[in-house]
C-alpha cells in the first residue's frame, strides 16, 4: 500500500510547519544519495521525501492534498506539486547550507578543481620491515596543474557555461508527473565546458609528474596504518604548496610468525618425552632464540607466554609478547627395543589391564548415577 505524505515524513496530519521542517531534515539526511551510493531503494525514498515536503510545506498545496489527495494536485500550475520550476538541490541547500558536502554543495566546493589536493597511495613492506622499521624508497606520480592554461584545460584559459544545464551542473529529469534533479552528463556536474582544449595538457588541466621519497617507516607499524608526508601530493592552481601524501601500509605475511596487534604467535613441535619430563626447549622469536621451560606433563596445544618478545608498540614503545602453542609429537615407527622400553615404562606406573578396567567401570557407574535420581 502506498504511503501518504505524512507517513513518508513520519509525522501526524496535525503537524505544524516547524515539525514538518525537522522531519524533512531528518529523512533527507537519512536517504540522501551521497550517503547511500548505489542503493536504489534509498534513492527512491529520498525522492518521495522531497515530494512530500514540497507539498506539505506549501499551505495551499497541503490544503488541497488534505482534501483531495494526490489527485487534487494534478491540476496545479507547473504540473503535480509544482515541481516543474523547483530544484531539489536548492531545497536541500536551504536547510543544510553550501558547506554540508551533499548534492549541489559539493559541486560548488569542487568547481574549478579537476582533482583533489591530497593524494593516497599504497605500498607493501615485509613482515620484518614492519616489526623493526626501515627506510624505503617510494615511487609515485602526482598531478601538477598545467601552467599554459592555469589548470583550466582550455586553450585561452577560460571555460564556457554549459549550454545543457545553464551552468548549474545539474538538470531536471521528468519521471511521470515528477521532476527530479541529477548531475549534468554533458559537463559532469561542473557547470562549465571546454570548447578549445589546451594543446599542452590536451584538456586535462594538469600533467602527471613522477616523484619519489625516502620514507622512514617506524618500528612496529601494522598493516592498514597510514603515514602522512606533507607537501608531497598534488598541486592546485590556487595553492602555494602541494597537498599531503598519505601512504597506506600493507604488511606481507611471514612463513613462521603470525602477528596480532603487538603479540607474535607460533606453533612449536615438542617430542612427547620433552613434554612428559618438563624439558627446556629453544623457541625462535623475532629477536632470536629464547628458552622455554615446559612444566612436567605439558599438554598438547597448551599455550605459553614469553613476555617482551613481541612487537614494539608504535605509540608507547612497550613490547608485546610471544605466544607459543606446543604441538606434541609421537614417533610413527618404533623398533622392538623402543617398544620394550615403553612397555617397561608403562609397567613402572602400575598400569595393569585389570586396574585400568576397574577404573573405567567405576567411572561408568558414576555417570549412570547422575541419571538415577
Curated annotation (Swiss-Prot):
Zn(2+) 1 binds at residues 146, 149, 198, 201. Disulfide bonds: none annotated. It comes from Campylobacter lari (strain RM2100 / D67 / ATCC BAA-1060). Homodimer. It is found in: Cytoplasm. The J domain is necessary and sufficient to stimulate DnaK ATPase activity. Zinc center 1 plays an important role in the autonomous, DnaK-independent chaperone activity of DnaJ. Zinc center 2 is essential for interaction with DnaK and for DnaJ activity. This is Chaperone protein DnaJ. Residues 4-69 form the J domain.
Amino acid at each position: 500500500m502506498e504511503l501518504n505524505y505524512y507517513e513518508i515524513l513520519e509525522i501526524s496530519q496535525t503537524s505544524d510547519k516547524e515539525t514538518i521542517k525537522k522531519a524533512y531534515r531528518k529523512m533527507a539526511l537519512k536517504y540522501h544519495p551521497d550517503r547511500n551510493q548505489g542503493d536504489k531503494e534509498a534513492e527512491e525514498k529520498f525522492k518521495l521525501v522531497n515530494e512530500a515536503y514540497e507539498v506539505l510545506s506549501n499551505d495551499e498545496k497541503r490544503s488541497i492534498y488534505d482534501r483531495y489527495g494526490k489527485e487534487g494536485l494534478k491540476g496545479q500550475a507547473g504540473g503535480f506539486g509544482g515541481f516543474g520550476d523547483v530544484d531539489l538541490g536548492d531545497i536541500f541547500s536551504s536547510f543544510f547550507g553550501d558547506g554540508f558536502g551533499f548534492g549541489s554543495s559539493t559541486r560548488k566546493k569542487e568547481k574549478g578543481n579537476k582533482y583533489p589536493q591530497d593524494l593516497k597511495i599504497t605500498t607493501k613492506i615485509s613482515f620484518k620491515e614492519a616489526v623493526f622499521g626501515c627506510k624505503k624508497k617510494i615511487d609515485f606520480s602526482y598531478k601538477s596543474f598545467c601552467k599554459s592554461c592555469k589548470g583550466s584545460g582550455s586553450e585561452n584559459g577560460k571555460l564556457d557555461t554549459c549550454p545543457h544545464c545553464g551552468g548549474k551542473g545539474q538538470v531536471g529529469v521528468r519521471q511521470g508527473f515528477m521532476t527530479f534533479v541529477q548531475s549534468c552528463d554533458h559537463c559532469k556536474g561542473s557547470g562549465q565546458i571546454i570548447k578549445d582544449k589546451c594543446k599542452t595538457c590536451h584538456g586535462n588541466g594538469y600533467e602527471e609528474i613522477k616523484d619519489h621519497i625516502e620514507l622512514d617507516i617506524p618500528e612496529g607499524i601494522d598493516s592498514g596504518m597510514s603515514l602522512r608526508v606533507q607537501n608531497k601530493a598534488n598541486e592546485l592552481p590556487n595553492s602555494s604548496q602541494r597537498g599531503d601524501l598519505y601512504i597506506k601500509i600493507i604488511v606481507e605475511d611471514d612463513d613462521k610468525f603470525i602477528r596480532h596487534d603487538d603479540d607474535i604467535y607460533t606453533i612449536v613441535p615438542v617430542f612427547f618425552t620433552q613434554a612428559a619430563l618438563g624439558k627446556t626447549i629453544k623457541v625462535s622469536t623475532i629477536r632470536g632464540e629464547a628458552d622455554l621451560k615446559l612444566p612436567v606433563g605439558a599438554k598438547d596445544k597448551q599455550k605459553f607466554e614469553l613476555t617482551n618478545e613481541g612487537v614494539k608498540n608504535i605509540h608507547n614503545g612497550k613490547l608485546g609478547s610471544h605466544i607459543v602453542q606446543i604441538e606434541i609429537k609421537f614417533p610413527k615407527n618404533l623398533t622392538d627395543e623402543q617398544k620394550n622400553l615403553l612397555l617397561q615404562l608403562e609397567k613402572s606406573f602400575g598400569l595393569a589391564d585389570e586396574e585400568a578396567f576397574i577404573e573405567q567401570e567405576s567411572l561408568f557407574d558414576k555417570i549412570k548415577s547422575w541419571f538415577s535420581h
